[in-house]
Amino acid sequence: MEYTPPPKPQLSSRANAFSIAALMSSGSSKDKEAAESTIKPLEQFVEKSSCAQPLSDLSGLEPHGDFSGSPSALCTEPLIPTTPIIPSEEMAKISCSLETKELWDKFHELGTEMIITKSGRRMFPTIRVSFSGVDPEAKYIVLMDIVPVDNKRYRYAYHRSSWLVAGKADPPLPARLYVHPDSPFTGEQLMKQMVSFEKVKLTNNELDQHGHIILNSMHKYQPRVHIIKKKDHTASLLNLKSEEFRTFIFPETVFTAVTAYQNQLITKLKIDSNPFAKGFRDSSRLTDIERESVESLIQKHSYARSPIRTYGGEDDLGDDSQATQSRGSAFTTSDNLSLSSWVSSSTSFPGFQHPQSLSALGTSTASIATPIPHPIQGSLPPYSRLGMPLTPSAIASSMQGTGPTFPSFHMPRYHHYFQQGPYAAIQGLRHSSAVMTPFV
């Protein structure tokens, strides 16, 4: 006799919705839809609009505003799409160019990354622009803001060395405009000078009270430069309504905000090209061609003493570099002699006796007894470099061969070895762990 299993009980529509098969099918379909919506190419967001409306701070500038630059960098989903606005005839003549474009291009090819911190971090490369076509008699306000490129969050895939979409963007942070501290400029100043935004700082602190630009980590951003024609009746720089303005965007300045560098090539390029990363630079890993290229970029991108530098400052830059090379530490003479070299060569002064512990410096007795002759100027010990100017009697006595005499006033605050007296200082230098720093 055959066994026939009992018929399976039919589930109601409500119970069927919670079955394993129903849950699995609905979950897979939702995941598929989420994945498709997440990995949409950025070009779809670019095609949705032909222009971008400034953020809330620039909402009053609609009647006279205009955006210049690549449409792909301008048009993003988080920004409000509007119709392109024709600028006034006077503002249409103004053009803006990005300085050190070659350096920006190098970073853009790799995917520029900018560090953001709680306290704020400066940008490198720096946004530096120059204007032409402005009215010499008019006054202009130059400002900068940074807007999101899209509404996506990214992650860096190390195995592919590329950025991938990780999901939707975090909630937008409060938008901020950075008004250049030297604004307003006259048109004549803008034609002669370069405007640098080197003091702009990026932060991820939503409660920042220092005026830094607030960004989200792992999001892509586009810096924008705005120039506004200031009218005489404008009471404040922040009263931008009814003002004529124009916006310039450079696609090569797009960057990803990060809390730590993701791409090692970006780290290397920043170390090699940033003049303030000198301590991390190892010139031996660069070829002659690379070193020459990097040095030329650094020279063009060297920081000026003020946020604005004239075009004729290249000659001054060369003078500054020569002056920097001529400056030495407290341990070198004008002839670039080290302290140990000066000690070994100072026996040319009659009456000078070496302590017995000098042999521990690695200088043989024979070399101490027969020093290499030096000219009189080079033989003078670097007391003036140590804060002890030579008196006329000291110089005269040293030239007459009777041994220099030095003033007996208190030595200024320099290295602690010299505060202990000459003999104790030489003994302190015997230890290899001694740190040679110019100041304490």
From Swiss-Prot:
Keywords: Developmental protein, DNA-binding, Nucleus, Transcription, Transcription regulation. PROSITE patterns: TBOX_1, TBOX_2, TBOX_3. Residues 308-333 are annotated as: Disordered. GO terms for biological process: aortic valve morphogenesis; atrial septum morphogenesis; atrioventricular canal development; blood circulation; branching involved in blood vessel morphogenesis; cardiac chamber formation; cardiac muscle tissue morphogenesis; cardiac right ventricle morphogenesis. Residues 321-333 have a biased composition (Polar residues). SMART domains: TBOX. It is found in: Nucleus. Residues 103-282 bind DNA. One of its GO terms (cellular component) is chromatin. GO terms for molecular function: DNA-binding transcription activator activity, RNA polymerase II-specific; DNA-binding transcription factor activity, RNA polymerase II-specific; RNA polymerase II cis-regulatory region sequence-specific DNA binding; RNA polymerase II-specific DNA-binding transcription factor binding. Acts as a transcriptional regulator involved in heart developmental processes. This is T-box transcription factor TBX20. The gene is TBX20.
